[in-house]
Amino acid sequence: MKLPTFLIGFVALLVTSNGSARYVYREDPDDSADPPNPGALHANPILIDVDDVQPFPQPRAITDSQKSALVYKPRLYIKSGCHPYPAVQANGSLSDGLQWKNFLRSPCPGSPKGSQVYSRSDWYEGKWAIMYAWYLPRALDRVTWLVNGHRHYWLWVVVWTDSPDPKTSTLLATSMPGVANNIHKYYPPKSKYVIREKTLKVKSYQNHILFIKHGLELTDRAGDFQDLVTWEQMTDEARAALSTFHRPEHAANPPLQDKRFYEVLEKAYPFDR
């Protein structure tokens, strides 16, 4: 007996949110984000326990782009939900995440090996865009009426400046996902949300009542830094693993992927066109 398409999709969401299926690889080339050396690093990566992923040590910044990413690195305050964890390690092994349960969830206070924030930068519409991305092993994000969260979740902030030169650039604006499927755009951010005109204070929080979602917003409370690694500083294996990772839940997929990166910049762009 052939199941209706909508029922197959519903079952798939239940399995991927709560069961053993944790990721699939993109097979549609129109939806894929190829690794730096196409065809060379597409072997399935190993999934390892969330607490065993070794973060990248923060490398020395060499280029202006890398220096700017360090200068504008936000401080993240965790009001509720999981703390950020490393998503991938140097050999391309990926975090297995944490199973979502509507009730009686285990705590996720951060990895014993340390945390990580990822970054990718480029020019977009005449502005220098610096994306920062944090990986959560699970998060509140309703996918069906019965499942209000899932394994794997990415939060991101885009910092908009006028130049990749950290010595002369100016913070113009910032964008980040809210809890209502919207994007907060601060143009410009108020001074109470910024330390020394460079460092944004960002809050990570959950909304259980109206929107059933995890999001970010600016705050006047300074949080913590995480070790930063930029897209180009990662190993080929790590970039390939992140680039080919795919889940049915949109927020579970790394915003650093080629296609997603520019999609996010387009939606997050805060200036008049």
Swiss-Prot record:
Official protein name in the record: NLP effector protein 10
Domain of life from the UniProt record: Eukaryota
GO cellular component terms, A-Z: extracellular region
Pfam families in the record: NPP1
Family: Belongs to the Necrosis inducing protein (NPP1) family.
Chain ranges for the short sequence motif Conserved heptapeptide motif as given in the UniProt record: 149-155
Keywords annotated in UniProt: Glycoprotein, Secreted, Signal, Virulence
Subcellular localization, as worded in the UniProt entry: Secreted
Motif Conserved undecapeptide motif per record, residues: 129-139
Domain notes: The structure of NLP effectors is remarkably conserved with a high level of conservation of a central region containing the conserved undecapeptide motif AIMYAWYFPKD and heptapeptide motif GHRHDWE.
Glycosylation site residues: 91
Induction text: Highly expressed at multiple time points in both early and late stages almost the entire host infection process.
Signal peptide: 1-21
InterPro entries linked to this entry: NPP1
Known function: Secreted effector that acts as a pathogen-associated molecular pattern (PAMP) recognized by the plant immune system. Seems not to induce necrosis in Nicotiana benthamiana leaves but significantly improves disease resistance of Arabidopsis thaliana to Hyaloperonospora arabidopsidis and causes an inhibition of plant growth which is typically associated with enhanced immunity when over-expressed in Arabidopsis.
